[in-house]
């Protein structure tokens, strides 16, 4: 049998077929590229070179290439996972507790409305850490929690500010996927506590916003309730429509309905 570049390409693609890998062929250079779908990292294989080796080593030449490419791509994937940073993400308590049956996510209770999950971030995307991924990473749950809290403190924060009826509202919205996660940055909360005169109210209506409010009057509570409900309804990953009083390092949910009262004949009408 005469081996050609075309036949070799077909042979390699069949032997290297994996759902997480994809192939790209440069017909001008006769180069087959095998790369990871998610990271786009990969290996280039010169088909004429493999064909030349096949003329001498036959089947062993193909086996050598398959082994080399497989090991290299698996090593890249492992390196990608290990080099990824771990961050905490805030989710609603109604969020699933398992990636699939028998494979629970790594979680920590947070408030009556929220729960902390942990994400392995590889710059372009992130994956929530479940027990199977935890084993692959070779980490303990405690190590994951410590790394996540350390990394969330490294995230920058710059608030936009708005004042309404004597109340001040601070908004954080960087869209990096971890805006709500900054609620776990204790030093951030303490620095905000020092500049707040009234009640400190915190809200994480969805993944991409953190609201901190300096509430001075009842109108302020109405505004934060309406605001949180609006953000919750609009969020891509909604968390909770409730806001929280923050005091002494604790979050207490505010069970308050947004009111839009009108006065009729001197009486309040709901």
UniProtKB/Swiss-Prot annotation:
Coiled-coil region(s): none
Superkingdom of this entry's organism? Bacteria
Q: State the similarity comment.
A: Belongs to the UPF0354 family.
Q: What is this protein called?
A: UPF0354 protein Bcer98_3354
Originating organism: Bacillus cytotoxicus (strain DSM 22905 / CIP 110041 / 391-98 / NVH 391-98)
What is the taxonomic lineage of the source species?
A: Bacteria, Bacillati, Bacillota, Bacilli, Bacillales
